[in-house]
Amino acid sequence: MQYNLTRIDPDAPNDQYPIGERETVSDPLEDQVHKNIFMGKLEDVLSGAVNWGRKNSLWPYNFGLSCCYVEMTTAFTAPHDIARFGAEVIRASPRQADFMVIAGTCFIKMAPIIQRLYEQMLEPKWVISMGSCANSGGMYDIYSVVQGVDKFLPVDVYVPGCPPRPEAFLQGLMLLQESIGQERRPLSWVVGDQGVYRAEMPSQKEQRREQRIQVTNLRSPDEV
């Protein structure tokens, strides 16, 4: 599996995004196993245990901007029960959150505020873009709307829809958990390579293309 390695560049200008460099590499743990099989396997076990704890205790920092936020909050109700995934503890401060959900239309005036809140989050941190407006500006192709939050934030998961159903948000959360389970992060903030290795996850759109092409009977939304 291929990984995207991201390193922070302290000498990069402040107006550069992302503030760092990216490159595609192979799994770093495989290289470690080839060098020292004992330490490599030990690091693999420790990394798996840490990732398991991280992905099952994600605390969200919600930033609702429009109608998609209503669908997101519905996922916290009893019929959907987001507590099954360990993500029911909404944080009021970004310093206590693990991931941020951008739900709704992002206006240009709000972009600096969102970016500042993201920078206040502690590592490791992730971003979910929820809804067509957050993903690409949606139907608001106008001067005052940012055409996608990935213009100024590193987005990990995109949840399509206008607005997405709560089930779609939960699926996006599960995809984020799957991605976190395969990440390669330094186990210490002092020792080792400080780069972050993120697995290249396949697109759900491409994975289900053949299945969608074979559909011949289109049911109404009330029957789904």
Swiss-Prot record:
Recorded catalytic activity of this chain's protein: a quinone + NADH + 5 H(+)(in) = a quinol + NAD(+) + 4 H(+)(out)
Keyword Metal-binding appears in the UniProt entry: yes
Ranges of Basic and acidic residues composition bias in the record: 203-212
Record's compositionally biased regions (Polar residues): 213-224
Annotated family: Belongs to the complex I 20 kDa subunit family.
Keywords for the protein's UniProt record, in alphabetical order: 4Fe-4S, Cell inner membrane, Cell membrane, Iron, Iron-sulfur, Membrane, Metal-binding, NAD, Quinone, Translocase, Transport, Ubiquinone
The protein's name: NADH-quinone oxidoreductase subunit B
Segments crossing the lipid bilayer: none
Protein's organism: Pseudomonas fluorescens (strain ATCC BAA-477 / NRRL B-23932 / Pf-5)
UniProt gene name: nuoB
Region (Disordered): 1-20, 201-224
Record PROSITE patterns: COMPLEX1_20K
Lineage, uppermost ranks: Bacteria, Pseudomonadati, Pseudomonadota, Gammaproteobacteria, Pseudomonadales
